[in-house]
């Protein structure tokens, strides 16, 4: 028994000594990234007055200048959004101001880096959340000008939503060659402000409900109702996942809802719409979902 103990101890020490470090932490001085999404309480704005106070901000990674190096965009809640240009060698430069992306008195939640207009350059779509108010309350679309600057054009593209947006997923749901948008919105009402009754999820809400926006020659039209997407204000959406669930080569949609509402699974009907069928696919579902992923 003593010999066995010595052998096991030797093996443990050998494994410990040969274990390689997989990651190395870089300081802000090394990387140039000093973003800090600092939150401050006020009597008017705190976790009790705003249920998503601690939900955080999104991060987008993409190559904005096609130099082969991924750049980083950070969403700020009570601080400005930040865009960092990858200079190579894990060195980044803050180009937020010169890029025209400084933000003030807005609550940014999610970000998507995607080529909206098909010009080969990544654009930036920022979802706004937090307490409604202010003249910059709507979501913002920053079109890449090709010179490390961006122009806000959400109105021109029909993407200036003013709900409590959490995130946006861009994908070609109708396979017509352009990107459409599933906009994930959080409810504008308090959690305790509902009386759950039958078919309440079938009652659309213009601000609190999710939206499916179809890209029609560069303008995003709201087709939520006609394609079978729930747009009620009982869905506290925190995650949207796109994938081909039934392997028919058509994109399907999974929506993760926080609090009491169940999740949604939309199967693409191959005719321009969706069927919500989660109860046929999943027998048991958790409450308070905050995200999902597809994998084999």
Annotate each predicted stretch with a short phrase.
Residues 1-8:
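Sec-dependent signal peptide recognition
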């Amino acid at each position: 028994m003593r010999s066995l103990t010595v052998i096991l101890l030797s093996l443990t020490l050998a494994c410990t000594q040969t274990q390689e470090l997989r990651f190395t932490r870089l300081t802000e001085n090394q990387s140039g990234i000093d973003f800090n999404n600092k939150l401050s309480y006020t009597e008017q704005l705190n976790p009790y007055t705003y249920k998503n106070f601690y939900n955080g901000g999104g991060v987008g990674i993409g190559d904005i200048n096609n130099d082969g190096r991924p750049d980083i965009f950070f969403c700020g809640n009570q601080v400005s959004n930040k865009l960092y240009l990858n200079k190579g060698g894990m060195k980044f430069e803050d180009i937020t101001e010169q890029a025209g992306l400084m933000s003030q008195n807005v609550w940014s939640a999610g970000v998507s880096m995607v080529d909206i207009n098909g010009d080969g350059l990544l654009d930036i779509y920022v979802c706004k959340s937090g307490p409604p108010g202010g003249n910059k309350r709507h979501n913002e679309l920053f079109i890449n000008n090709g010179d490390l600057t961006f122009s806000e054009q959400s109105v021109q593209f029909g993407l200036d939503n003013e709900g409590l947006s959490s995130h946006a997923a861009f994908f070609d749901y109708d396979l017509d060659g352009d990107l459409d948008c599933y906009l994930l919105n959080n409810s504008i009402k308090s959690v305790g402000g509902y009386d759950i009754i039958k078919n309440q999820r079938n009652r659309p809400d213009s601000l609190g409900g999710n939206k499916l926006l179809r890209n029609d020659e560069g303008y995003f039209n709201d087709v939520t109702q006609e394609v079978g997407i729930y747009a009620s204000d009982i869905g506290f959406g925190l995650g949207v996942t796109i994938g081909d669930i039934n392997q028919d080569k058509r994109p399907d949609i999974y929506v993760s809802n926080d609090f009491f509402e169940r999740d949604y699974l939309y199967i693409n009907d191959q005719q321009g719409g969706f069927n919500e069928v989660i109860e046929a696919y999943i027998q048991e579902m958790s409450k308070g979902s905050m995200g999902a992923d597809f994998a084999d």
